[in-house]
Swiss-Prot record:
<protein>
    <recommendedName>
        <fullName>2-dehydro-3-deoxyphosphooctonate aldolase</fullName>
        <ecNumber>2.5.1.55</ecNumber>
    </recommendedName>
</protein>
<comment type="pathway">
    <text>Carbohydrate biosynthesis; 3-deoxy-D-manno-octulosonate biosynthesis; 3-deoxy-D-manno-octulosonate from D-ribulose 5-phosphate: step 2/3.</text>
</comment>
<dbReference type="GO" id="GO:0008676">
    <property type="term" value="F:3-deoxy-8-phosphooctulonate synthase activity"/>
</dbReference>
<keyword id="KW-0808">Transferase</keyword>
<keyword id="KW-0448">Lipopolysaccharide biosynthesis</keyword>
<dbReference type="Pfam" id="PF00793">
    <property type="entry name" value="DAHP_synth_1"/>
</dbReference>
<dbReference type="InterPro" id="IPR006218">
    <property type="entry name" value="DAHP1/KDSA"/>
</dbReference>
<comment type="similarity">
    <text>Belongs to the KdsA family.</text>
</comment>
<dbReference type="GO" id="GO:0019294">
    <property type="term" value="P:keto-3-deoxy-D-manno-octulosonic acid biosynthetic process"/>
</dbReference>
<keyword id="KW-0963">Cytoplasm</keyword>
<dbReference type="InterPro" id="IPR013785">
    <property type="entry name" value="Aldolase_TIM"/>
</dbReference>
<comment type="pathway">
    <text>Bacterial outer membrane biogenesis; lipopolysaccharide biosynthesis.</text>
</comment>
<dbReference type="InterPro" id="IPR006269">
    <property type="entry name" value="KDO8P_synthase"/>
</dbReference>
<dbReference type="GO" id="GO:0005737">
    <property type="term" value="C:cytoplasm"/>
</dbReference>
Length: 280
């Protein structure tokens, strides 16, 4: 059976990033969903400038379709075709790798033509046909641990990728269900998943979600993003995933748990300090 890579390199040239438990933290960041070309470029420009000033590797993320909205009326995004055009333009302009989530087998090949990292949503982390189709694109995979899975259960998830010929997999912690409308983050999961051999990413913003907690939409407690992110980075992770928006309270999705764009410099400075200590 193919071994997973403990050091995953993504992108090319000056924008290339490395995910490794032993190397400097890499950031995955961007708005929850792609709202427009103009909005994507605005957020990306701010993040690129910030990450350059900090010497921090950046993967830009955004979703073309929020397929698991709480309500049928929830806004879902601009769609696959338009989003791929925007992602291609973003890569040409800024040089960074990009990440987006996929929901069906049919989307894998189309998205992989442009996107560097295919993300498997937590709710779909056991869907074998989707995982195999994603693996066969050859792109790096970021698979979110299902809220219903133990960290050691990710061994079987990881094997679906490696046995399909893809060793470039990131395992992402995003909280575990704890009763109704509540998630908790068990920091033990980070070293447990790292012991499986793949780099581990901590999703600091979805971990503070309150699923369905607002009745027709998901709630969240963004005031705890920094607390959990600092804890995870202190334990030791290859990357941290943070959704951000210039006006989270008026964002079309996941506003309650997104970090205001203006607060990102302070957050990242603190996380890099913790990362330096954890990996000293």
């Amino acid at each position: 059976m193919m071994e997973t890579n403990s050091r995953v390199v993504v992108g090319e040239g000056a924008g290339q990033v490395v995910f490794s438990q032993k190397e400097r933290l890499t950031l995955i960041a961007g708005p929850c969903q792609m709202e427009s070309r103009e909005h994507a470029f605005m957020i990306a420009g701010e993040l690129v400038e910030l990450c350059r000033s900090l010497g921090l590797g950046l993967v830009y993320k955004s979703s073309f379709d929020k397929a698991n909205r709480t309500s049928l009326s929830g806004k879902r995004g601009i769609g696959l075709d338009k989003a791929m055009e925007v992602f291609a333009d973003l890569k040409r302009e800024f040089g960074f790798p990009v990440l987006t989530d996929i929901h069906t087998e049919e989307q894998c090949a189309a998205v992989a033509e442009t996107v560097d990292i295919l993300q498997i949503p937590a709710f779909l982390s056991r869907q074998t046909d989707l995982l195999v189709a994603a693996a066969k694109t050859g792109r790096t995979i970021n698979v979110k641990k299902g809220q219903f899975l133990a960290p050691w259960d990710m061994k079987n998830v990881l094997a679906k990728f490696t046995e399909s010929g893809n060793p470039n997999v990131l395992l992402c912690e995003r909280g575990a269900s704890f009763g109704y409308n509540t998630l908790v983050s068990d920091m033990r999961s980070l070293p447990i998943m790292a012991a499986l051999g793949a780099p581990v990413v901590f999703d600091a913003t979805h971990s503070v979600q309150q699923p369905g907690g607002q009745g027709g939409s998901t709630g969240g407690q963004r005031e705890f993003v920094e607390t959990l992110a600092r804890a995870a980075v202190a334990v030791g992770v290859a990357g941290v995933f943070v959704e951000t928006h210039e006006d989270p309270d008026n964002a079309p999705s996941d506003g309650p748990n997104m970090v205001p764009l203006k607060d990102m410099p302070r957050l990242l400075e603190k996380l890099l300090a913790f990362d330096a200590v954890a990996k000293a």
